[in-house]
A protein has these predicted regions:
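Sec-dependent N-terminal signal peptides of Gram-negative exported proteins
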Residues: 1-4
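OB-fold and OB-like single-stranded nucleic-acid-recognition modules
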Residues: 6-113
């Protein structure tokens, strides 16, 4: 007799977009200038950066600045915010930095500060 683990899910989709830990303590923020300077064509690393989305290039692509450096960011399609953003809105972005010809951060989550 072979026993295999089985998962059973009752009814539909259980992915709550608002689910997760609501942590309000300190967060290690990456220095954007250092991340860019230390990158190569194949660099991929998780980052948390704080600053502003200063220009929209496409429906999900923006220019982000921390006040010292700029980088292109692409927002995940699943990101939904309760409030609109503008070029003066201070945000914290959680995502993955990717080096290359056009270094960018693929943003998984935005926190309005």
């Amino acid at each position: 007799m072979i026993v295999t683990p089985t998962l059973a899910f009752a009814g539909g989709n259980h992915q709550d977009k608002n689910a997760g830990v609501q942590y309000s303590g300190p967060v290690k923020v990456s220095d954007l200038t250092q991340v860019i300077n230390d990158s190569s064509m194949f660099t991929e690393q998780k980052v948390v950066v704080e600053g502003k989305l200063v220009q929209q290039l496409d429906h999900d692509t923006f220019i982000f600045t921390d006040g010292k450096a700029q980088v292109q960011v692409e927002l995940d399609d699943d990101i939904v915010l309760a409030q609109p953003l503008d070029a003066n809105t201070q945000v914290r972005l959680f995502g993955e930095f990717e080096g290359g010809n056009t270094p960018e951060i693929e943003v998984d989550r935005i926190q309005v500060l």
